[in-house]
Each structure stands twice: as structure tokens, then as C-alpha cells.
């Protein structure tokens, strides 16, 4: 049936795809009311700078200080980061009907046992607060070690979201491991191909990121895998439109806003019935095959390493923010803005500008901070505040 004039693209998308809010800003989640929400260190760092969330930050630090029992500040901050992620997750679960994704420290991405222990610990925090593990996805990078950690956690009833996924070999390994959900990064795949080809743009239907998600979706539906596909990291509306029908799409507030205003007929582009009839060869992906395929896929190997580095930098920035706030709570420093310290974390070449490549974290936060839209963040723009810029993006 053709849509009525009142049906926006977002309303139509919601009939065929689960929309997920890619934000840690509780106000944005209240506005868009998605079924699920995802968070990561970049988003939490942004949200933690907003005055309205100061009580969550301070509460996490006080809780960590009590738990640490006189330990040094580094240990307190480490505990507070986990607590803060869970506290934001709990607030989000009070709004959404479905699930929230909470990320394991990206610096553990090649340590299977450490990721298993961290996943268990995060779930313990959620359950101690009265939340069901069925509503939480533990987000882990799609390294071979991360996939093995997720396999262990899934067997314990701890559901996982495998992120930083760029290649079919990663997707197949995740499905074989019984992972609940994967997050292929559409926009970052596009970024790599644009840089390699020198092209400024691709038609949405030929966007390399879109084609990658379609291939994964078709493979999963062809062979009956239960793992859900959640497209992530979008650069433009065209990518979202071309993936209508995907199991889930995690969308930043600015694109949710555009979708809620746009009208016209939205065609379903991905359909399980159509995928099941396609001629697709089954691929075996054991560890040797995974590592060989990953080495051959320069895009996937480049972007996975870059993504882990980016999320790790975001954690360093969050650690600096919490360390400074802990000093304030102890009366050892005045409340101030940590912009200069954050800037040093990301300005790798010390030229006074943060490029998208140097940032490496969540695109929606980068775009929000890039107030003049020139593709670079100056110290003045960062000094405007992660939180303030984040609200500009979600308004």
C-alpha cells in the first residue's frame, strides 16, 4: 500500500527495520524513542560533559572510590568507567523497550579471557541494579579473539554485539559462534574506498559499505543464521534508504531527524525471502581461514585496527575527564574544562587540528564538534564542549 502524505521515511522504515539510536544522550533517546540504543566511549565521553549528567558521573566516581578501598586514582577511574557505562545504560533502559549495547574496553580486543571477564562483570553490574541480562548486549570488537570471547559469553546467556565488522569473514565467524548481533560499519567502509579510489562519492546503491551489508545479509538469510545484522556508521541518508529492510539500523540523531522530516515512498531493499533464493556458496571460516582472509582484505584489516585505536583513544579521553573530576570532588582542583587534555589525545601530529583520521571514534561526535563543517576540529571547537556540540548534533 502506498504511503500517505503523513508517513515519513522514518515511519516507513520502522515498519520493516528496527531503528536503534546511536547516542549516549538520554534526551535524544527520549525524543526519538527507538526500540534499542547503542553507546560507546566516544558517546559516553560526550554525554558526560553535559551538566545534566554530572550527577551520573559524580555518582560513578563516588561508587568507585568506595569500592576501591583506598586504591590509587587510576584504579578508581577504571572502576568508574565501567560503572558509568552501566549507569548510562540503565537510564537508557528506562526509556527504550528493547536493549542497550555496552562496550568492552577496546584495549582488550586481542585478549579473549579479559573480554570474557569484563563482559561477565558488566552483566553483574546490570543485574545487581535489577536489570535483566536479556536487555543488554555486550559490545566487542570483531577480532578472532573477540569472536571467541563472544562465543563463551553467549553460552552463558550473555548476549553480544560484535562491532567494528568490515568483512564477510568476520560476519561468518560471528554467525558460526552463535553471536546475537553484528554491527557492520557502512560509512567507514565507504571512507576507505573513497580514499583508495580518489572518488568523492558513490551512488547510494553502489556504495561499498551498502554492498558489504547486503552481502552479509544475503549470506545470513540464505543459510538460516539467527545472528541479527545491524548496519551502523552512516555517512548519508542514501545509505540508510538503500538498507531499508535490514534487521536493524543504528542511526545517529541527526539522521533520525532528517528521516522524520522526509516523505515519499520508501522501498524495501533487503528481504529474507529474496535472499534465501540467491545462488551463494557456503564458506568455511576456521581460525586459519579467518586470519588468511583478514590479511587479504586490506580494507577490513585497516579499518579494524583503526577502529580499535579510535575507541581506545576515546577511553583515554574519558579517563582524563574522570581523573580531573575526581580531583575536583576531592577538593584538589577547581572545576574546569578538560578540552586541552582531550585535544592532546587526538591531535596525533601536534599541528593544532584534529582530522577525522586522527579522531577515529564515533562519527556523530566528530561531526558535532566540527562546528564549521570543514572536516577538522580546532581547539576552539573542542573547547566549546563535547556536550554542547553533541546537543547541536541531536537537536
Residue ranges of each PLM-predicted region?
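N- or domain-start disorder-to-order transition segments that initiate the globular core
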Residues: 1-23
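Acidic Ca2+-chelating loop motifs
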Residues: 349-359, 372-383
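Catalytic alpha/beta core domains of metabolic enzymes, predominantly
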Residues: 161, 166-281
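Primarily EF-hand calcium-binding motifs
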Residues: 336-349, 361-373
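Active-site beta->alpha loop and helix N-cap motifs at the rims of alpha/beta catalytic domains
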Residues: 43-45, 50-144
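C-terminal extensions of enzymes
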Residues: 270-271, 277-337, 343, 348
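Hydrophobic faces of well-ordered beta-strands that scaffold small-molecule active sites
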Residues: 17-22, 35-39, 79, 98-104, ...
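Conserved, mostly hydrophobic/aromatic
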Residues: 40, 102, 138, 153, ...
Amino acid at each position: 500500500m502506498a504511503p500517505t502524505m503523513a508517513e515519513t521515511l522514518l515511519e516507513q522504515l520502522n515498519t520493516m527495520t528496527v531503528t536503534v539510536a546511536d547516542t549516549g544522550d538520554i534526551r535524544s533517546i527520549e525524543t526519538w524513542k527507538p526500540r534499542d540504543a547503542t553507546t560507546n566511549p566516544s558517546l559516553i565521553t560526550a554525554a558526560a560533559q553535559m551538566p545534566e549528567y554530572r550527577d551520573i558521573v559524580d555518582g560513578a566516581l563516588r561508587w568507585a572510590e568506595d569500592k576501591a578501598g583506598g586504591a590509587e586514582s587510576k584504579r578508581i577511574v577504571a572502576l568508574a568507567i565501567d560503572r558509568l557505562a552501566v549507569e548510562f545504560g540503565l537510564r537508557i533502559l528506562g526509556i527504550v523497550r528493547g536493549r542497550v549495547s555496552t562496550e568492552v574496553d577496546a584495549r582488550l580486543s586481542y585478549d579473549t579471557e579479559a573480554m570474557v571477564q569484563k563482559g561477565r562483570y558488566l552483566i553483574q553490574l546490570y543485574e545487581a541494579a535489577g536489570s535483566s541480562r536479556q536487555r543488554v548486549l555486550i559490545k566487542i570488537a570483531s577480532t578472532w579473539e573477540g569472536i571467541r570471547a563472544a562465543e563463551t559469553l553467549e553460552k552463558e546467556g550473555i548476549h553480544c554485539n560484535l562491532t567494528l565488522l568490515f568483512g564477510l569473514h568476520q560476519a561468518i565467524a560471528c554467525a558460526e559462534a552463535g553471536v546475537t548481533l553484528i554491527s557492520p560499519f557502512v560509512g567507514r567502509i565507504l571512507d576507505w574506498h573513497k580514499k583508495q579510489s580518489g572518488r568523492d562519492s558513490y551512488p547510494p546503491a553502489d556504495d561499498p559499505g551498502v554492498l558489504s551489508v547486503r552481502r552479509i545479509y544475503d549470506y545470513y538469510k540464505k543459510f538460516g543464521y539467527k545472528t541479527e545484522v545491524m548496519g551502523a556508521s552512516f555517512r548519508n541518508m542514501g545509505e540508510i534508504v538503500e538498507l531499508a529492510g535490514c534487521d536493524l539500523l543504528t542511526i545517529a540523531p541527526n539522521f533520525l531527524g532528517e528521516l522524520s522530516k522526509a516523505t515519499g515512498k520508501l522501498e524495501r531493499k533487503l528481504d529474507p525471502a529474496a535472499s534465501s533464493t540467491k545462488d551463494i556458496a557456503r564458506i568455511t571460516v576456521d581460525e586459519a581461514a579467518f586470519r588468511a582472509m583478514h590479511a587479504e582484505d586490506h580494507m577490513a584489516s585497516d579499518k579494524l585496527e583503526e577502529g580499535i585505536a579510535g575507541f581506545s583513544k576515546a577511553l583515554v579521553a574519558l579517563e582524563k575527564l574522570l581523573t580531573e573530576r575526581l580531583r575536583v570532588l576531592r577538593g584538589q582542583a577547581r572545576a574546569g574544562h578538560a578540552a586541552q587534555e582531550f585535544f592532546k589525545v587526538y591531535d596525533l601530529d601536534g599541528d593544532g587540528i584534529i582530522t577525522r583520521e586522527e579522531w577515529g571514534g564515533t562519527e556523530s561526535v566528530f561531526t558535532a564538534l566540527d562546528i564549521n563543517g570543514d572536516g577538522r576540529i580546532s581547539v576552539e571547537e573542542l573547547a566549546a564542549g563535547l556536550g554542547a556540540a553533541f546537543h547541536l548534533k541531536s537537536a
